[in-house]
């Protein structure tokens, strides 16, 4: 009788352990198959808005290892370009005074006078730089993003752009490109521009002409070697430039891309919701606008589709920077 009780107890323990094991396996299976789950959402307690929450890339999506001659896009690697620096000592005396770019807040479907003056200054002085399309007769818009680092929303942005068939330019630093090659390859293969935002994101007016060229060339070399890609569009880190810097960028074959529409979207501690992003951007749109958004902003990622739809309803046409008129 005692032996029967012991056997029953042992059988009960085995059944309990088996049930626990199956439960744990189910939890693990749930964690390892995020594709079967809907994208998580979060509700902003201040506004009551529900927004999508970006999830981190799974381990299997991390940076692959390239073999000799391969690129992340499958395109053939491009030959490296030697940037010959004209007047490396700036003997011509071009101003090296730091200018913090200012564009003004556009209202009423017209660019702010500051943006108009900026474009006139670039054109009148022969700089290969632009912030505003004053030539096209269409209501053109040029959508650009600054991508200093990855915050999990670039994939959502690319999905929206693909759905809406809208071209964009992504100005990336070298660490962003090195750490997220799949995202960069997707940008390129889906027809977007990957712009040059420098290697280390320094303030260009503090650099020599040779150092400026090295910052641009380092990024260009990496894109050519690892992605078989190069486009001559540059954006100054922090929007800080000088006459000397503008001249240098143009002298090595690049065009400096500024903007006429933007807002304070980069501060992750001060995101104000999808509706705020939509209202702010649409209120500032105007024909010929170069729009600057930051890819780290969840508000931008969630509002982008609505912004595009609204703009098109108003007769705007989205174009690539490759279509921007020569100044």
Residue ranges and their predicted role:
Residues 2, 128-130, 276-280:
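A generic local structural motif
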Residues 2-5, 235, 312:
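Basic side chains
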Residues 4-23:
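Sec-dependent N-terminal signal peptides of Gram-positive bacterial secreted proteins and lipoproteins
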Residues 14-17, 158, 209, 306:
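Hydrophobic alpha-helical membrane context
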Residues 17, 193, 203, 218-219, ...:
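Short, intrinsically disordered/low-complexity patches at protein termini
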Residues 20-144, 150-156, 163, 309-310, ...:
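N-terminal pre-catalytic segment of deacetylase/amide-hydrolase enzymes
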Residues 97-99, 139-141, 151-158, 162-292, ...:
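Metal-dependent polysaccharide deacetylase catalytic core of the NodB/CE4 family, i.e.
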Residues 285-322:
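Catalytic grooves of carbohydrate-active enzymes
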């Amino acid at each position: 009788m005692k032996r029967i009780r012991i056997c029953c107890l042992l059988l009960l323990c085995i059944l309990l352990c088996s049930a626990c094991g199956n439960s744990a396996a189910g939890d693990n299976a749930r964690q390892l198959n995020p594709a079967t789950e809907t994208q998580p959402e979060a509700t902003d307690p201040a506004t009551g808005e529900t927004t999508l929450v970006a999830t981190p890339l799974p381990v299997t999506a991390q940076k692959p290892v390239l073999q000799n001659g391969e690129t992340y896009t499958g395109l053939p690697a491009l030959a490296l370009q030697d940037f010959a620096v004209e007047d490396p000592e700036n003997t011509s005396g071009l101003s090296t005074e730091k200018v913090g770019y200012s564009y003004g807040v556009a209202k009423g479907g017209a660019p702010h006078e500051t943006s108009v003056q900026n474009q006139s200054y670039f054109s009148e002085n022969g700089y290969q730089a632009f912030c505003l399309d004053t030539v096209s007769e269409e209501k053109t818009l040029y959508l650009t993003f600054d991508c200093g680092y990855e915050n999990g929303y670039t994939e959502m942005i690319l999905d929206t752009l693909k759905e809406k068939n809208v071209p964009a330019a992504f100005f990336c630093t070298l660490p962003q490109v090195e750490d997220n090659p799949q995202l960069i390859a997707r940008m390129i293969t889906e027809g977007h521009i990957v712009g040059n935002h420098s290697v280390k994101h320094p303030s260009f007016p503090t650099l020599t002409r040779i150092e400026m060229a090295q910052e641009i060339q380092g990024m260009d070399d990496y894109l050519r070697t690892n992605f078989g890609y190069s486009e001559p569009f540059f954006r100054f880190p922090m929007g800080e430039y000088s006459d000397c810097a503008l001249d240098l960028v143009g002298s090595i074959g690049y065009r400096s891309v500024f903007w006429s529409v933007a807002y304070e979207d980069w501060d992750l501690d001060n995101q104000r919701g999808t509706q705020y992003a939509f209202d702010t951007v649409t209120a500032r749109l105007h024909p010929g606008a170069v729009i600057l958004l930051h890819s780290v902003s969840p508000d931008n990622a969630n509002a982008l589709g609505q912004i595009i739809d609204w703009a098109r309803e108003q007769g705007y046409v989205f174009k690539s920077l490759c279509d921007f008129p020569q100044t």
